Curated annotation (Swiss-Prot):
The modification N6-acetyllysine is found at residues 61, 169, 176, 185, 197, 218, 240, 246, 252, 258, 333. This is Acetyl-CoA acetyltransferase, mitochondrial. Succinylation at Lys-263, adjacent to a coenzyme A binding site. Desuccinylated by SIRT5. Pathway: Lipid metabolism; fatty acid beta-oxidation. NCBIfam families: AcCoA-C-Actrans. The modification N6-succinyllysine is found at residues 61, 73, 169, 176, 185, 197, 218, 238, 240, 258, 261, 263. Activated by potassium ions, but not sodium ions. The gene is ACAT1.
Length: 422
């Protein structure tokens, strides 16, 4: 202080210089480094087929079940959850603030702030990423994040205005808001066909990949590899016994002999994408409880995994299937890792061609990619899927191993997240 006082007596120029030094050294954050963020529980519902076993439940109810299951698995009081983010794409007809409905339905305090995230198919993962950022910065210390979708309950709509002579045309919001490239006015499946052509990926390769996805999913269920991540869903039917759904529904509904014979859906001439080698319309929800490492110590909770890195990327809208190949290198660079350091890859199977394209572009080992199947065989509730693949990695990895999940989204985007099992 005597030195500063002496400097201040030497005139205005030195006084200004001292003020600049003080300003530069001033800190506006409680910690100079980011908090470490850990996953302490990771839960999902079974995935229901379109108009299938879970179709009587709205997305918000499925979200409540996943959130409640995750908090119970974490073994913490609900009051400890300071905020919640959930991904949800097809919100038409769900009512105000879907995440708020899901959170209050799970029994969390009325004071819990809630936000719904819509990044199309990457919504569930983006919710986890944004919650992680909140925790890293110290804005909160315990959060819930995930994704939910009930494609079975998405309504049809018609334009407002006078009814014209000849009637009105109803639009399916699944197609309009979830599966259409608004820039090129084409279905996501046509974008997938464009990718297949660009990278010379054949119908036969896609069919083989789809068969492998179904085979892997069946083997994983039979070996109990999904058991720790799935919470049963009880369906109450008036006048009948309750129905308990414990397993994914979609992977059982396949006839392998029909796959090579199916007609292409989006491009009749020289097309490659069929109903079998694309993902299906589905219902489900997934949630994780995230907290800072300090909060985990305070609550005496043993983490499953830590959030190591995450990133987004964007390309031309028609090339959305390729976008993960641009997000993944960002994640690896941020984490200081190489591809060889990754034990398991999850690349969301929106279409078989998506995974095949990213394996080719990133030169990944196919034996490490979606080793327990993916959306082609398990199903693709679009707001849930990004969270589901993170949930699966949190359980499937062994201690010390790294897993990298990536998912493309309509509009030319992708999100990717790296976790390390603890």
């Amino acid at each position: 202080m005597p030195v500063l006082a002496a400097l201040l007596r030497r005139g205005p120029l030195l006084q200004r210089r001292v003020q600049e030094i003080r300003y530069a050294e001033r800190s506006y954050v409680s910690k100079p480094t980011l908090n470490e963020v850990v996953i302490v529980s990771a839960i999902r519902t079974p995935i229901g087929s379109f108009l299938g076993s879970l179709s009587s439940l709205p997305a918000t109810k499925l979200g409540s079940i996943a959130i409640q299951g995750a908090i119970e698995k974490a073994g913490i009081p609900k009051e400890e959850v300071k905020e919640a983010y959930m991904g949800n794409v097809l919100q038409g007809g769900e009512g105000q603030a879907p995440t708020r409905q899901a959170v209050l339905g799970a029994g969390l305090p009325i004071s819990t702030p809630c936000t719904t995230i819509n990044k199309v198919c990457a919504s569930g993962m983006k919710a986890i990423m944004m919650a992680s950022q909140n925790l890293m910065c110290g804005h909160q210390d315990v959060m819930v994040a995930g994704g939910m979708e009930s494609m079975s309950n998405v309504p049809y709509v018609m334009n407002r205005g006078a009814t014209p002579y000849g009637g009105v045309k109803l639009e399916d919001l699944i197609v309009k808001d979830g599966l259409t490239d608004v820039y090129n006015k084409i279905h996501m499946g046509n974008c997938a066909e464009n990718t297949a052509k660009k990278l010379n990926i054949t119908r036969e390769e896609q069919d083989t990949y789809a068969l492998n996805s179904y085979t892997r999913s069946k083997a994983a269920w039979e070996a109990g590899r999904f058991g720790n991540e799935v919470v049963p869903v009880t369906i109450t039917v008036k006048g009948k016994p309750d129905v308990v759904v414990k397993e994914d529904e979609e992977y059982k509904r396949v006839d392998f002999s029909k796959i090579p014979k199916l007609k292409t859906v989006f491009q009749r001439e020289n097309g490659t994408v069929t109903a079998a080698n694309a993902s299906t319309l589905n219902d489900g929800a997934a949630a994780v409880v995230l907290m800072t490492a300090d909060a985990a110590k305070r609550l005496n909770v043993k983490p499953l995994a830590r959030i190591a890195a995450f990133a987004d990327a964007a390309v031309e809208p028609i090339d959305f299937p390729l976008a993960p190949a641009y997000a993944v290198p960002k994640v690896l660079k941020d984490a200081g890792l190489k591809k060889e350091d990754i034990t398991m890859w999850e690349v969301n199977e929106a279409f078989s061609v998506v995974v095949l394209a990213n394996i080719k572009m990133l030169e990944m080992d196919p034996q490490k990619v979606n080793i327990n199947g993916g959306a082609v065989s398990l199903g693709h509730p679009i707001g849930m899927s990004g969270a589901r693949i993170v949930v699966h990695l949190a359980h499937a990895l062994k201690q010390g191993e790294y897993g990298l999940a990536s998912i493309c989204n309509g509009g030319g985007g992708a999100s990717a997240m790296l976790i390390q099992k603890l």
